[in-house]
């Protein structure tokens, strides 16, 4: 039976957290500056996390704290300190992969979600984790039919356990992220969140024959780089099996968080009101505006032993849209909802702009009205200050970006 599903969005800082909540996330997941799987993201100070939790709770939303790296003996005191802080800060759950950390979190009364790093691929393993966790984040390597079986068997065994699954974002070439390539090549530990992603580089594949000769099989291709996951075309099926939809992207910017959250929120709501299929093409087009390596459905409809869809020919970002910084807000007049923007790039009526700031989050606007010296203009030039009528509240110092489609 289809039920309302939670939408869980990523945040690498306060700007992303506020953006996610403003655009419809039910919950946000984030990390402190230690012991989480995105060590290279901005991440939160303790003070920022407290502020973010307050913002979420004031809006009846939740915050989940990632503490899901490999935990070594010398990490144990730090783990205890982080869990104590999480408890006092009133986080809504901790995302954990280490069993000892789960037990400690249980003793503190913290709600636990078993991380995707736990590699839960069957109902027996899920049932085991239900002793420690209220939710498991299922392995990305499962098919939709396998997930259905897991859910049915848990229900049959009367196991009270929520299931969370990824619906959008980057995929790892290794099983649930357990990769040693970054560590081997650069001494940067992927399983402690410090991956340098050598899989995203171009590689040369050479075959050595028995006679000692070499043959270049493939050169300058993205052999190890999977396409990004995008399940926007399968929301109704996924709502049948998951309690929570997770958007990957704790290393991504606020505009990515804004658009993915907005579209998946609208998609979920449209399934419930019956308008999903009418809006599907719009959803797909909007998701092409964010950074992507071309889209795929991951393992949901593919056997793990069959061929996979990799990036191969695509040079980095497959999106046809680019974000260009064009100015900053120097004043905002609340009564008339007009932002005064100092430009270092031309701006014209009909352009789509993004305005991003720590308190503002990320907002998108289509420019419909501009004035210079109280006179309407169609185009504002680089170096000018222009008043732009907006639908959102923005703030002095916010950065302004032009969203431009490339040919």
Swiss-Prot record:
Superkingdom of origin organism: Archaea
Protein's name according to its UniProt entry: Uncharacterized protease MJ0090
UniProt-recorded Gene Ontology molecular function terms: peptidase activity
Keyword Cytoplasm in record: no
Top EC group: hydrolase
Keyword Protease: yes
Entry-linked InterPro entries: Peptidase_U32, RNA/ubiquinone_mod_enzymes, Transl_B-barrel_sf
UniProt GO BP: biosynthetic process; proteolysis
Signal peptide: none
EC numbers for this chain: 3.4.-.-
Gene3D superfamilies found in the cross-reference section: Translation factors
Recorded family membership: Belongs to the peptidase U32 family.
Pfam entry (one): Peptidase_U32
SUPFAM superfamilies: Translation proteins
Entry keywords, A to Z: Hydrolase, Protease
């Amino acid at each position: 039976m289809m039920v309302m599903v939670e939408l869980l969005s990523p945040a690498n800082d306060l700007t992303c957290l506020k953006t996610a909540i403003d655009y419809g996330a039910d919950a946000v997941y984030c990390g402190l500056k230690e012991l989480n799987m995105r060590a290279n993201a901005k991440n939160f100070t303790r003070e920022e996390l407290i502020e973010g939790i307050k913002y979420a709770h004031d809006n009846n939303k939740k915050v989940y704290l990632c503490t899901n790296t490999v935990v070594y003996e010398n990490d144990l005191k730090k783990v205890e300190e982080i869990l104590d802080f999480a408890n006092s800060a009133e986080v809504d759950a901790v995302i954990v992969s280490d069993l000892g950390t789960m037990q400690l979190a249980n003793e503190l009364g913290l709600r636990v979600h078993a991380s995707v790093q736990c590699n839960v691929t069957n109902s027996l393993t899920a049932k085991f984790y239900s002793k420690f966790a209220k939710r498991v984040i299922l392995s990305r390597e499962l098919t939709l039919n396998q997930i259905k079986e897991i859910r049915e068997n848990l229900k049959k065994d009367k196991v009270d356990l929520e299931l969370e699954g990824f619906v959008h974002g980057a995929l790892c070439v290794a099983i649930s992220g357990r990769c040693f390539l970054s560590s081997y090549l650069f001494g940067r530990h992927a399983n402690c969140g410090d991956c340098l992603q050598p899989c995203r580089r171009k590689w040369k594949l050479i075959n050595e024959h028995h006679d000692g000769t070499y043959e270049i099989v493939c050169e300058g291709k993205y052999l190890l780089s999977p396409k990004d996951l995008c399940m926007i075309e399968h929301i109704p099926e996924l709502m049948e099996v998951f309690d929570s939809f997770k958007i990957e992207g704790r290393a991504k910017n606020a505009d990515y968080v804004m658009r993915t959250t907005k579209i998946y929120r609208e998609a979920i709501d449209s399934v419930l009101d019956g308008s999903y299929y009418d809006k599907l093409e719009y959803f797909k087009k909007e998701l092409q505006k964010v950074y992507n390596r071309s889209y795929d459905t991951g393992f949901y409809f593919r056997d793990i032993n069959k061929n996979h869809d990799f990036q191969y020919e695509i040079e980095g970002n497959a999106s046809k849209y680019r974000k260009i910084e064009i100015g900053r807000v120097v004043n905002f007049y609340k009564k008339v909802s007009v932002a005064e923007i100092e430009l270092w790039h031309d701006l014209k009526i009909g352009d789509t702009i993004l305005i991003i700031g720590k308190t503002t989050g990320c907002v998108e606007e289509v420019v419909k009205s501009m004035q210079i010296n109280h006179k309407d203009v169609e185009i504002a030039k680089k170096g000018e200050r222009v008043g732009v009528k907006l639908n959102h509240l923005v703030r002095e110092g916010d950065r302004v970006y032009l969203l431009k489609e490339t040919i």
